[in-house]
Amino acid sequence: MILAKPAPFVSAFIEAVDQASRQDHPNAGLSAIQRTWLAFCVTATLVTHSICWARFERASLGTYSVAALSWMFRHSKLPWDQLLVASVRVILRDHGITSGSLVIDDTDNPRSKSAQKLAYLYKRRE
């Protein structure tokens, strides 16, 4: 699939996350370039089913290069911790969730047997 521009629902979500982030930290919003880059990366992740700069470049038919995409990720001062909090707030607000409890239950997934040299890796605590 060819990516000419980010999906409209992804762009709307990124805008909502940016607004939610600016409510808590007025000076820490995303720039237009950061919003465009983030929307492209989220759209490319949905389209390619992977997080791979080379696949993103191929999907955009060379509009974005691997070097430019990875440079933006490594050098842009994106407030990842604030974006995580803001995105969770946007998702909860959009789905009308006002209260609840978070329960993480991973007891049905046995640990991977690929790491042989780590002590107590396979010991399960119930």
What are these regions (language model features)?
Residues M1-L84:
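Gly/serine-rich nucleotide phosphate-binding loop at the start of the catalytic core
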Residues F40-V42, S70-E126:
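Active-site-proximal, Lys/Arg-enriched surface segment
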